Amino acid sequence: MSTFQHVIQTEADLRAILGYAGGPATNKVISEIDDICRAYIESSPFVLLGTSDATGRMDVSPKGDPPGFVQVMDSHTLLIPDRPGNRRGDTLTNLLQNPHIGLLFLVPGRKETLRVNGTAQIVRDEAVRDRLSMQGKAPVFVIAVTVQEAYFHCTKCMVRSHLWTDEHKNDALVSLGVAIIQHAQLDISREEADAYLAEDEQTGLY
């Protein structure tokens, strides 16, 4: 592990360099999902979920589906379907220990992002699960988020990254199959791993 010589350890030291936010940067935070936020969420096919366990160990998990897959139940409640995955349950087990959650919504082609913070429960109500069905299959679990904060994040990171262009497209990276073989120390070929993942993409979505 690297040893650094100049490490910020107090907020006073941080603020002496960073300064303080003011105006719109602080006033933009609202405590509910208004019509503007609702429209963005209903247009979003992708959201990142940040959670932590009781010790503070963090995890960020991506969720994706057709636009509007996260439903606005009311101005203070969001419903997120938990589709089939690898059964690790990182987000779910974290929420059982610590209900706090942070969401980051993206809409392809848009430079702004929407941040939502709150608390969450794992629910199994049949009516709730049914309203989030895809291809005739209801999610096993639904993450119900009680919204405490909602605000739009500025566009600078998207402008810097050129995320929605092909400028940084990289086909030279190894396949996911190769990465899993190496990291999980599997005794299978790249072709077998890639074939399994390709089939899972077709048959295991819902």
Regions flagged by a language model, labelled:
Residues M1-Y206:
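Binding-site signature for planar aromatic cofactors or substrates
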